[in-house]
Regions:
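N-terminal basic/disordered segments at the start of proteins
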Residues: 2-37
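Weak global preference for isoleucine
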Residues: 8-10, 22, 62-63, 70-72, ...
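Generic secondary-structure signature for well-ordered alpha-helical cores
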Residues: 24-28, 61, 80, 84, ...
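Short, surface-exposed linear patches
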Residues: 30-32, 84-87, 110-114
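N-terminal beta-loop-helix "entrance" segment that forms/cooperates
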Residues: 30-55
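Glycine/small-residue-rich interface belts in oligomeric ring/scaffold proteins
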Residues: 44, 51-102, 107
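Short, glycine-/small-residue-rich phosphate/pyrophosphate-handling segment
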Residues: 96-124
Length: 124
């Protein structure tokens, strides 16, 4: 069974340009922006934690343009089985870093390499 297309989750307009650059690298990926803080996202959401947890439970690869700690704390209660994790990455808002967080068996390192190459940087 194939995974859904990746979700690029952003918290503010400052991340939108980087999110769109990543989206160009990943056919079918969508940009999800925080309602009231992001204009021009493909879809909006109102609660970061609920949204990221729902994406994770739906096996959707997650590319979060925010601090890695926010993503880790959000998903910590759901981390049960390493083999069943979708890829989860944190990307710096300014496109200076790509950090694979979860989903080593699910292709997170390959996804990190694709994104990093497209942004002209090395993955962490």
């Amino acid at each position: 069974m194939s995974r859904p297309a990746p979700a690029i989750v952003i918290l503010g307009n400052g991340s939108l340009d980087t999110a769109r650059r990543i989206q160009q690298l990943l056919p079918g990926a969508s940009v999800l922006g925080l309602a009231g803080r992001v204009d021009g996202a493909d879809r909006s959401y109102s609660d970061f934690g609920d949204t990221v947890r729902q994406l994770y439970q739906q096996d959707t690869p997650i590319i979060a343009l925010c601090a890695a700690g926010i993503v880790i704390r959000t998903l910590a209660p759901l981390l049960l089985e390493k083999g069943a994790e979708p890829p989860v990455l944190a990307v710096a808002e300014d496109a200076s870093a790509v950090v694979p967080l979860l989903g080593g068996l699910g292709g997170v390192n390959d996804l990190a390499r694709v994104i990093a190459a497209g942004l002209g940087i090395a993955p962490a």
